[in-house]
Amino acid sequence: MTNIRKTHPLMKIINNAFIDLPTPSNISSWWNFGSLLGLCLIMQILTGLFLAMHYTPDTSTAFSSVAHICRDVNYGWFIRYLHANGASMFFICLYAHIGRGLYYGSYMFQETWNIGVLLLLTVMATAFVGYVLPWGQMSFWGATVITNLLSAIPYIGTTLVEWIWGGFSVDKATLTRFFAFHFILPFIITALVAVHLLFLHETGSNNPTGIPSNMDMIPFHPYYTIKDILGALLLILALLTLTLFTPDLLGDPNNYTPANPLSTPAHIKPEWYFLFAYAILRSIPNKLGGVLALLLSILILIFIPMLQTSKQRSMMFRPFSQLLFWTLIADLLTLTWIGGQPVEHPYIIVGQLASILYFLLILVLMPTVSLIENKLLKW
């Protein structure tokens, strides 16, 4: 008798994706982040669902409803901080996943890569609208500043911003629609994840060498299921440590002050995972130029496959490209630091240099060095 997991229409899908899936035998722990992102998404949807049961998306009660969750709901504080810090873990995994893709040339699977970029944008949008919901000072002013960037669009900008606000400022209508977006987007993300996996399983996984691994595949279960469980346990350990010991480490103290349109915080800044893009935005003195640089800093990922000049897919055997890659990581960390600093000397010039280096590395230096490596290898 044939095994039910290979014949049943639903079980067959699960079997082909997580059990009998042929997987390269040499993929490292950098390949764990995909499953960790899936775990993060499930955790965020579940904790978010329980938070939504007690939250009220209204300017007069939003802040107090979050306080009520933390004070009066059974383990409400725990669910709230799991959700807030879960977002941070989500972005750590997301950036590691993208970094892995850049280093090992996984972007050559173009459909998978492009859906991944779309996923990144959707997750960023979800995190942004979610940050507005507690209706603290940084929620309100963050929403005001970021939505206002759209006013830089010529001709239709101002109308567009007022349309998004649902009025002439960030107010009740804005909060209500942001709650609606924050509720629906994770389900859109889940659908996109399914498409992301669909395209990935058309080609199979890449591996650290970048060489086709068709001749040396092993079943996903038990080898990589057990490896993924280990990764998941480590992620949960990190999340619980953060949530139970220092729940406010990554948050902004200003968000414990209720939103006040008449009082602007000294330093308006987004959550840490957006700081690199915020630093690039601030480094250009012109409003429209800053907005375009901000957009390009993320959308540049779409052009990565076109900038591939190396004859080798992975950076595993390319020391010069490796050096530039780690320079890029250091540059992104510098931008993240600058994004959280006030706009004054010497931070301004450091931010501008780091922004120039970011685009220079991706668009010029890395493709050029790849060509030099080809020459050195007589290819």
From Swiss-Prot:
<keyword id="KW-0479">Metal-binding</keyword>
<keyword id="KW-0830">Ubiquinone</keyword>
<feature type="binding site" description="axial binding residue">
    <location>
        <position position="83"/>
    </location>
    <ligand>
        <name>heme b b562</name>
    </ligand>
</feature>
<feature type="binding site" description="axial binding residue">
    <location>
        <position position="182"/>
    </location>
    <ligand>
        <name>heme b b562</name>
    </ligand>
</feature>
<dbReference type="InterPro" id="IPR016174">
    <property type="entry name" value="Di-haem_cyt_TM"/>
</dbReference>
<dbReference type="GO" id="GO:0005743">
    <property type="term" value="C:mitochondrial inner membrane"/>
</dbReference>
<feature type="binding site">
    <location>
        <position position="201"/>
    </location>
    <ligand>
        <name>a ubiquinone</name>
    </ligand>
</feature>
<keyword id="KW-0249">Electron transport</keyword>
<dbReference type="GO" id="GO:0046872">
    <property type="term" value="F:metal ion binding"/>
</dbReference>
<dbReference type="GO" id="GO:0006122">
    <property type="term" value="P:mitochondrial electron transport, ubiquinol to cytochrome c"/>
</dbReference>
<keyword id="KW-0349">Heme</keyword>
<feature type="binding site" description="axial binding residue">
    <location>
        <position position="97"/>
    </location>
    <ligand>
        <name>heme b b566</name>
    </ligand>
</feature>
<keyword id="KW-0496">Mitochondrion</keyword>
<dbReference type="InterPro" id="IPR005797">
    <property type="entry name" value="Cyt_b/b6_N"/>
</dbReference>
<keyword id="KW-0813">Transport</keyword>
<comment type="function">
    <text>Component of the ubiquinol-cytochrome c reductase complex (complex III or cytochrome b-c1 complex) that is part of the mitochondrial respiratory chain. The b-c1 complex mediates electron transfer from ubiquinol to cytochrome c. Contributes to the generation of a proton gradient across the mitochondrial membrane that is then used for ATP synthesis.</text>
</comment>
<keyword id="KW-0679">Respiratory chain</keyword>
<dbReference type="InterPro" id="IPR036150">
    <property type="entry name" value="Cyt_b/b6_C_sf"/>
</dbReference>
<keyword id="KW-1133">Transmembrane helix</keyword>
<dbReference type="GO" id="GO:0008121">
    <property type="term" value="F:ubiquinol-cytochrome-c reductase activity"/>
</dbReference>
<dbReference type="InterPro" id="IPR005798">
    <property type="entry name" value="Cyt_b/b6_C"/>
</dbReference>
<feature type="binding site" description="axial binding residue">
    <location>
        <position position="196"/>
    </location>
    <ligand>
        <name>heme b b566</name>
    </ligand>
</feature>
<keyword id="KW-0999">Mitochondrion inner membrane</keyword>
<dbReference type="InterPro" id="IPR027387">
    <property type="entry name" value="Cytb/b6-like_sf"/>
</dbReference>
<keyword id="KW-0408">Iron</keyword>
<feature type="transmembrane region" description="Helical">
    <location>
        <begin position="288"/>
        <end position="308"/>
    </location>
</feature>
<dbReference type="InterPro" id="IPR048259">
    <property type="entry name" value="Cytochrome_b_N_euk/bac"/>
</dbReference>
<dbReference type="Pfam" id="PF00033">
    <property type="entry name" value="Cytochrome_B"/>
</dbReference>
<dbReference type="GO" id="GO:0045275">
    <property type="term" value="C:respiratory chain complex III"/>
</dbReference>
<protein>
    <recommendedName>
        <fullName>Cytochrome b</fullName>
    </recommendedName>
</protein>
<keyword id="KW-0812">Transmembrane</keyword>
<feature type="transmembrane region" description="Helical">
    <location>
        <begin position="77"/>
        <end position="98"/>
    </location>
</feature>
<feature type="transmembrane region" description="Helical">
    <location>
        <begin position="226"/>
        <end position="246"/>
    </location>
</feature>
<feature type="transmembrane region" description="Helical">
    <location>
        <begin position="113"/>
        <end position="133"/>
    </location>
</feature>
<feature type="transmembrane region" description="Helical">
    <location>
        <begin position="320"/>
        <end position="340"/>
    </location>
</feature>
<comment type="similarity">
    <text>Belongs to the cytochrome b family.</text>
</comment>
<comment type="subunit">
    <text>The cytochrome bc1 complex contains 11 subunits: 3 respiratory subunits (MT-CYB, CYC1 and UQCRFS1), 2 core proteins (UQCRC1 and UQCRC2) and 6 low-molecular weight proteins (UQCRH/QCR6, UQCRB/QCR7, UQCRQ/QCR8, UQCR10/QCR9, UQCR11/QCR10 and a cleavage product of UQCRFS1). This cytochrome bc1 complex then forms a dimer.</text>
</comment>
<dbReference type="InterPro" id="IPR048260">
    <property type="entry name" value="Cytochrome_b_C_euk/bac"/>
</dbReference>
<dbReference type="Pfam" id="PF00032">
    <property type="entry name" value="Cytochrom_B_C"/>
</dbReference>
<keyword id="KW-0472">Membrane</keyword>
<feature type="transmembrane region" description="Helical">
    <location>
        <begin position="33"/>
        <end position="53"/>
    </location>
</feature>
<feature type="transmembrane region" description="Helical">
    <location>
        <begin position="178"/>
        <end position="198"/>
    </location>
</feature>
